[in-house]
């Protein structure tokens, strides 16, 4: 059994070696500063109106000249053969086949070659109409397709077009994302330029575009420029997190901003606002009719050739400029909570009065007032990317964490202040000489130390089942290891001061800009907080092992907001399940899954923000009366 009082980052009794991990940060010191106020062309309709190309004994009859005039050079396919129509420049493929049956239910089959009709906007699999898909890929967008019901000839119409680099990158990332979802235990959302994206495009070049493969290998550099520029579609991460074991040569990594692959489709100019294709993220390469034109793509030309009418004032508005977040709801590059400071991602508060006052000359060059912003919350409970030791590696889905060297900790994105709550952790890998301490922590718990090191956290250790609080270890149960599923229950009374309080609005805090995002900066007063801690009667923490209640671990714990927390020693790997479905749901008590705190926190913070504006004089920048 380890000696009580082990130091930060150090497994008790294991020696000081691996524990000496210096604090790291994802920010360069000079990059944080106070913030001062201050479509691809659609396919031509002339093609669809051309005389129909009827299947014949290997020849394209009638309408050949018209197709050549419009497209410049097309390949015509039929069920009996393939002929090449000679023309200049771009080569494309067109097909008219006898109709199969229209998919009445319009069901999607992601991962298959699907085609969207440019008139009715319904989706069909290519096999429905017997279309040759040997030169096609799933999630392609460089085509024009009319189903047999919509096309004037009564036949299906399919034209494969030349793809630009943006469309090729979009298709490649969509296919890589789908493959990872279906094949990997922990799906990835970001992919290496050299190891994933370039090899995929090189392998499937002929399937992705009708353009000839270039003789010079300059296109890999061009796709990097394309994805780095198209930030309304692609995510870019140029370097690994500080302390990460990811090799630098795997970067830059790219991913899709919108992870809903069903949004990917061709940019038809007659697409209706009520169509099945979502305009989220502009993944279809254009802005659908009826779109408001908001977001980063708003400055580009609309489908009718005009501009969005965005004024100079709107472009320079620092408050409501679009702030696009990755699929998991947090910027890829961000400041870490460290050195006595905490950072809360901010977004414009739509309920703030008079946001246009920033346009007044008197505000030029001055910091943006914090009451015009609010804490940016994600509706899912996940592991926090910023509220962790930088050396810990978090998976793309933010549900798995891998340890590194000495003990260090990560907290969840949401905490609880009252009621009974539960979550599970599965030990995926626990090699010899590794360990874990799992449990609950308040926001001020030391991230560069094992859970249970200070007064703000309570933990259960894998070795010998020891429980820890204030670095004092006591026997609790048998230990746990690889393959075990552990449950964590907490019950906090409803009548405490913390339980009756609304969450902090942070509106009286300074706004800090880092990598194009704004954050509230909050100073930690650990010593003052420790002295003000008081025990909460009738509160308790219980741990479970493979569905078996191990007994009450702690009673009358300190009052505060508690977050699910994980601390790992060396290369241990665990996955967390916030619910609502658990492998071993407790049957001996009532609880709510931690996943319920996702929307619960949104409601609480919204109420706090609205009350702030109602009860506080905005120009005075005074804290709400319920805050100390």
Swiss-Prot record:
Modified residues (Asymmetric dimethylarginine): 296
Cellular localisation: Nucleus
One Pfam family of this chain: ASH2L-like_WH
Polar residues biased stretches: 270-282
ZnF PHD-type span: 1-66
Membrane-traversing stretches: none
Modified residues (Phosphoserine): 101, 316
Phenotypic consequence of residue 296 to K: Abolishes methylation
Biased composition (Low complexity): 36-65
Zinc keyword on record: yes
SUPFAM superfamilies assigned to the protein according to its UniProt record, in alphabetical order: Concanavalin A-like lectins/glucanases
Domain of life assignment: Eukaryota
Protein name: Set1/Ash2 histone methyltransferase complex subunit ASH2
Organism: Homo sapiens
